[in-house]
A protein has these predicted regions:
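Alpha-helical transmembrane signal-anchor/signal-peptide segments
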Residues: 145-164
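Membrane-helix interface segments in multi-pass membrane proteins
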Residues: 1-13
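Membrane-cytosol interface at the C-terminal ends of transmembrane alpha helices
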Residues: 11-111, 143
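Soluble "head" domains of membrane/secretory-pathway proteins
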Residues: 118, 160-589
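Membrane-interface motif at the C-terminal end of an N-terminal transmembrane signal
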Residues: 135-149, 574-581
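Cytosolic-side transmembrane helix boundary signature
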Residues: 91, 95-127, 207, 247
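Hydrophobic alpha-helical membrane-embedded or membrane-associated segments
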Residues: 10, 14, 18, 39, ...
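Internal/C-terminal transmembrane anchor helices
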Residues: 116-145
Length: 589
């Protein structure tokens, strides 16, 4: 829905409101025309029902308006004598249209000085809960949102189980684009695991003014651009288009801003030709292959615990150990431990075996295919098979196994997956440790389009900026017109995790559009070891040293938890003293 369509929708709703209420405006001593003027009619209605005019501001806030509108409908009915429980329920169930019935068929009286307080304790409680939910939703949507780190892509900078506060206003609060949605939840409703929103209608993208721009090395929360799963981390081939603001929330480090050039060479990150120097708090990790001495005596789990390495490891056939996440400090600790003969970073220099999608003919005999998939999964893993959908993914399939699968009659189609951006055969020699140069698009900047660079910008043109793109040989058509250039409509960013060999980031799916930006993590209020890989006791899993620490800044994070406890104790002491003083004064009276 574009802006003009949205304005027309607002006018239609305003007209419907006028048709349903103009006689009630007359009974309240107002003019009939006042019911027909958009926005102004709502302000007048607030005067009629004796409620604050700022309620009208809430009416225009997506999601919040779903909470305030039923309240306004009920208050309007009560103002004109319709105070029964049945009246209130009918008003809500009919989406306020019951007011139109009252407007034309009922001889009601305007009660200008009615009792505003709810008639029963139950209604009073319901009203209090409703406004508490409105306030919480307002804060959650436009100011601060709680967030939990779900994966180890930023380990050890941010840990799995860090409970964050994410600021919406640092980069400018984005208004919800999906107006019909359950408050205080994201894309699914907890427990029942059902979709929490209606995909249509959609509101045009709008962002309030920002306190600051996104800078290089900022940690940023954003909506995962290529998210097409029904729910976060769902293991299914079935795809579903999701609105921007209902795509899964990701958190990464912004290493490249609009206009930058990104190059990764032998795992080293270069921006605009210069080696990136990350903030002191960042803990970049890589995967290493470690060869221990034959006579070394150690417990691998205890060793990793001492290194605070919380990612996984793999013991290989030659007795070497692949440790998936080590910092430079960890590497030096191992080198000085006297336990190892050799340690080397796992760098992907050449094209590795590809992943493949097999489309399976469910109408033919597929026993051989299923047996081959089962044997492969049992012997080496890396197989996803959905029989109902007739599709399978086999990860890291070498040429010999690929040719064997192609001989099965049950295989209708074989598609390679090029996992590194821009995900095409032409750039299949790029890896997560060696790629680029990639130019990050900037709003308003024009580029020359060719069939060679089009893979980098195809998704921007079609998915993010919603143009029709057709390619016929060397001819490129956008919205039906031949062209050799394109001007970007918004800014884009390059996001990467600090845990470089265990992070799904821009190296795999490309640029993050500006309209996908959610906010800036600013504060860790609690941290709990969700994975518990070292089998700690329950209380030991609380990482109290991380309680009440800031996300950004220089030097080691300082916990403000003790100061919070002091303030909390002071508050309770003051409250106890105040209560005791009041009781003493009452006794004297």
């Amino acid at each position: 829905m574009d802006i003009s369509t949205w304005i027309i929708t607002v006018l239609i709703i305003s007209t419907l409101h006028a048709i349903c209420t103009w006689k009630l405006y007359l009974k309240a001593g107002k003019k009939a025309w006042e019911a027909f003027v958009p926005v102004y009619n709502g302000i007048v209605l607030m005067q009629i029902i004796n409620r604050p005019k700022w309620w009208m501001f809430l009416v225009f806030l997506p999601v919040i308006n779903l909470l305030i509108l039923p309240v306004i409908w009920i208050e309007t009915l009560r103002t004109f004598g319709k105070k029964t429980t049945a009246d209130m329920w009918i008003g809500v169930i009919t989406f306020g249209l019951y007011i139109g019935y009252v407007n034309y068929t009922q001889d009601v009286t305007y009660e200008a000085k009615r009792e505003l307080k709810p008639a029963t304790k139950a209604l009073d409680t319901l009203g209090s809960l409703t406004f508490a939910l409105i306030v919480a939703t307002f804060v959650h949507t436009y100011f601060i949102q709680p967030f939990v780190i779900p994966t180890s892509s930023l380990e050890k900078t941010l840990l799995v189980g860090d409970f964050l506060f994410v600021s919406k206003f640092h980069y400018g609060a984005r208004t919800p684009m999906t107006p019909v949605a359950a408050p205080m939840v994201h894309d699914s409703i907890p427990l029942i695991k059902k979709k929490s929103y209606l995909s249509k209608p959609q509101i045009p993208y709008f962002r309030f003014p920002a306190l600051q721009k996104i800078e290089r090395n900022d940690i940023v929360v954003f909506n995962w651009p290529i998210d097409t799963v029904r729910m976060f981390r769902e293991n299914s081939f079935e795809k579903q288009h999701k609105p921007i603001d209902k795509k899964s929330n990701y958190v990464k480090r912004c290493v490249g801003i609009p206009g930058d050039e990104v190059l990764i060479k032998n795992s080293e990150l270069f921006i605009n030709g210069k080696l990136v120097q990350l903030p002191s708090r960042s803990k970049v990790q890589f995967s290493y292959k470690v060869k221990f001495k034959k006579d070394a005596q150690f417990d691998i789990n205890k060793l990793l615990q001492d290194l605070s390495s919380t990612d996984s490891y793999l013991i290989q056939a030659d007795s070497s150990v692949v440790i998936n996440a080590l910092t430079d400090e960890n590497v030096n600790q191992l080198k000085n431990s006297g336990l190892i003969d050799k340690i080397e970073k796992n760098i992907s220099n050449d094209k590795e075996d590809l992943d493949y999608i097999f489309t399976i003919d469910k109408n033919s005999n597929i026993t051989d295919v299923e047996n081959a998939l089962a044997n492969l999964q049992e012997n080496r893993g890396g197989v996803r098979y959905n029989k109902e959908e007739g599709r399978a993914i086999v990860y890291r399939l070498n040429d010999e196994l690929l040719n064997a699968f192609k001989q099965f009659k049950g295989i209708k189609k074989t598609e390679p997956i090029y996992e590194i951006f821009p995900n095409t055969k032409e750039y299949s020699n790029w890896t997560g440790d060696n790629l680029g140069v990639v130019k990050i698009p900037e709003a308003g900047k024009k580029i020359t389009l060719t069939t060679q660079n089009l893979p980098f910008y195809k998704m921007i043109i079609t998915d993010y900026e919603h143009h029709d793109l057709q390619v016929n040989g060397n001819e490129i058509r956008i919205d039906g017109k031949p062209t050799n250039s394109y001007t970007f409509q918004q800014n884009y960013y390059w996001m990467m995790g600090d845990n470089r060999h265990n992070s799904e980031d821009s190296r795999y799916w490309g640029f993050v559009p500006e309209d996908h930006i959610v906010g800036k993590p600013i504060f860790i209020w609690m941290s709990f070891d969700l994975d518990n890989k070292f089998h700690k006791g329950f209380l030991e899993r609380f990482r109290t040293e991380r309680f009440f620490t800031t996300v950004s800044g220089e030097g080691q994070p300082e916990s403000y938890f003790k100061y919070f406890l002091i303030l909390l104790a002071g508050y309770f002491a003051w409250d106890w003293y105040r209560g005791k003083k009041k009781k003493k004064e009452a006794d004297l009276l």
